[in-house]
From Swiss-Prot:
Pfam families: Ribosomal_S2
Record GO terms (molecular function): structural constituent of ribosome
Name this polypeptide is given: Small ribosomal subunit protein uS2
Keywords: Ribonucleoprotein, Ribosomal protein
InterPro entries associated with the record: Ribosomal_uS2, Ribosomal_uS2_bac/mit/plastid, Ribosomal_uS2_CS, Ribosomal_uS2_flav_dom_sf
Keyword Ribosomal protein: yes
Family listed: Belongs to the universal ribosomal protein uS2 family.
Superkingdom of origin organism: Bacteria
GO biological process, one term: translation
PROSITE patterns: RIBOSOMAL_S2_1 (PS00962), RIBOSOMAL_S2_2 (PS00963)
GO CC, alphabetical: cytosolic small ribosomal subunit
């Protein structure tokens, strides 16, 4: 039994690709037809590919490894945060800071600074500092929280990365590939599927499509976590 149905995919508009003039020929195997200058994705293939990605993510979670959800485009930001939080995983939904994976130690220092500022705010240190100083520190904290809030508990590199639109997230994809971290991704008709280990052919521009597919990956994590606790 497939984890997602054609009906769900159709209702969410997962089948709408990009305009035909903006395409990557490597996506040809996943294209069903062309309609009014737009490529239509073959949803039978998407159903199979979602199954493969789901099984892989579930397996990673069963092994106790973490998954990093990445989607910084407007249409993905809310879904990425909500679904990653729902399954207790990490996320980046604002901007990918170069080196988030390849320069992990430096990023850890920035996270330590964020924790330090949070502690200062919680233990009353801010109350005894001059207003101007506090305002500066709060601004610094907000900025760090915005970019690093979703990975502040990440102590080691993730076991896999789920990415929405590998073209937009090309720096994240390049870093993951360099480190040999497996990639699962929603890949639209204008992307290069060769960069992604588990390709989910689908619309990466519609909020409903992104939400549906991201939620499925979060479900896979939850099922994998359940499998891990059952095994213990």
């Amino acid at each position: 039994m497939a984890v997602i149905s054609m009906k769900q995919l159709l209702e969410a508009g997962v089948h709408f690709g990009h305009q035909t003039r903006r395409w990557n020929p490597k996506m040809a195997p996943y294209i069903f037809t062309e309609r009014n200058g737009i490529y239509i994705i073959d949803l039978q293939k998407t159903v199979r590919k979602v199954d493969e990605a789901y099984n892989f993510i579930r397996e990673v979670a069963t092994q106790g490894k973490k998954i990093l959800f990445v989607g910084t485009k407007k249409q993905a930001q809310d879904s990425v945060k909500e679904e990653a939080e729902r399954c207790g995983m990490y996320y980046v939904n604002q901007r990918w800071l170069g080196g988030m994976l390849t320069n992990f130690q430096t990023i850890q220092k920035r996270i330590s600074r964020l924790r330090e500022l949070e502690k200062m705010e919680a233990d009353g240190t801010f109350e005894v500092l001059p207003k101007k100083e506090v305002s500066k520190l709060l601004h610094e904290k907000e900025k760090l929280e915005r970019f690093l809030g979703g990975i502040k508990d990440m102590k080691e590199l993730p076991g896999a990365i789920f990415v929405i639109d590998p073209r937009k997230e090309r720096i994240a994809v390049a870093e993951a590939r360099r480190l040999g971290i497996p990639l699962v991704g929603i890949v639209d008709t204008n992307c290069d599927p060769d960069e992604i280990d588990y390709v989910i052919p689908g619309n990466d521009d519609a909020i409903r499509a992104v939400k549906l597919l991201t939620a499925k990956m979060a479900d896979a994590v939850l099922e994998g976590n359940q499998g891990q606790s059952d095994a213990q």
